[in-house]
């Protein structure tokens, strides 16, 4: 069963807020901007992560230095799963944040 529009927006909002909270609590020097449903994380080295919602197909998209990734929400797992690699969003963010900033952060709740 496909996510309802309201459920999709609630999930993306909660995910983006969790990402913001993790970066806020990390002490890492980042700029966070959340505007019109797009969350941008800018690292002090100029690289960035961009989280956007694709409402018509109910996906969360992540743009990073290493590429673009599309995530579907798995209700059974309660996680966002990459549609090309089956990697969980939290696992991918650990790897990408390390690659782009050199910092090891935990994204277990994602």
UniProtKB/Swiss-Prot annotation:
Keyword RNA-binding: no
GO CC terms of this entry: cytosol
Residues passing through the membrane, by range: none
Gene Ontology BP term (one): iron-sulfur cluster assembly
Entry keyword annotation includes Metal-binding: yes
UniProt-listed PROSITE patterns: FRATAXIN_1, FRATAXIN_2
Alphabetized SMART domains for the sequence: Frataxin_Cyay
Cysteine pairs bridged by disulfides in the record: none
Similarity comment text for this entry: Belongs to the frataxin family.
Protein name: Iron-sulfur cluster assembly protein CyaY
Organism the protein comes from: Ectopseudomonas mendocina (strain ymp)
Gene for this chain: cyaY
């Amino acid at each position: 069963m496909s996510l309802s529009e309201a459920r999709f927006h609630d999930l993306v909002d909660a995910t983006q807020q969790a990402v913001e909270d993790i970066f806020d609590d990390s002490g890492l020097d980042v700029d966070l901007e959340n505007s019109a449903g797009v969350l941008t994380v800018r690292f002090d080295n100029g690289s960035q992560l961009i989280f956007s919602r694709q409402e018509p197909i109910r996906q969360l998209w992540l743009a990073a230095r290493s590429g673009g990734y599309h995530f579907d929400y798995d209700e059974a797992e309660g996680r966002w799963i990459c549609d090309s690699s089956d990697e969980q969003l939290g696992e991918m963010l650990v790897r990408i944040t390390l690659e782009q900033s050199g910092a090891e952060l935990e994204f277990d709740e994602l």
